[in-house]
Regions:
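Conserved beta-strand/loop scaffold segments within soluble protein domains that form the structured core
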Residues: 1-118, 132, 139-160
Length: 160
């Protein structure tokens, strides 16, 4: 109905033969609604991640505010991320955006941390957790969010 709000988020990490596929379809069919999709993946050792997301704004769904972002952090050259973000808009008074990025750890950020004495593994962990933070921050239950951060830290530690 009118004035509805939906936030959907996901964060995942993958190793080796891991294949993770997210498919999200959000339909706006009422006035003054908001949707937010935030999906983050960290992949290593040949893992594969896929994101397929769509925001559909039907005629008459004026004042819609739709946001969709899908990002991956590839920790090696063997991993891959495939994305298909979509917007389908049939109303003229909307604010919708979507995007997808995929890349390695920022070399300048790594250099900055290393130049301040942070060991390479710890710097990688810190930058990886910072990358995932936007999705984890969408979780309102802080106890659950803290548990997820602990699991992510455990996953990062297994590489050493």
């Amino acid at each position: 109905g009118d004035d509805a709000i939906a936030h959907v988020a996901g964060a995942c990490v993958g190793d080796g033969d891991f294949h993770h596929d997210d498919t999200v379809f959000v339909t706006h069919d009422a006035v003054n609604c908001e949707s937010r999709q935030v999906f983050k993946k960290v992949l290593r050792n040949g893992a594969v991640g896929v994101f397929q997301g769509k925001i559909l704004v039907k005629p008459g769904a004026q004042k819609t505010d739709g946001y969709q972002i899908s990002q991956s952090l590839l920790l090696d050259d063997d991993s891959q991320f495939l994305a298909k973000p979509e917007l389908e808009i049939y109303a003229d008074d909307v604010a919708c955006s979507h995007g997808s990025t995929s890349g390695a750890i920022d070399e300048e950020a790594m250099f900055y941390l290393r130049s301040r004495g942070v060991p390479e593994g710890a710097a990688t962990d810190l930058l990886t957790l910072a990358f995932l933070a936007e999705a984890v921050d969408e979780i309102e239950n802080r106890e659950l969010a803290d548990d997820i951060v602990t699991r992510l830290q455990d996953w990062l530690a297994r590489r050493r």
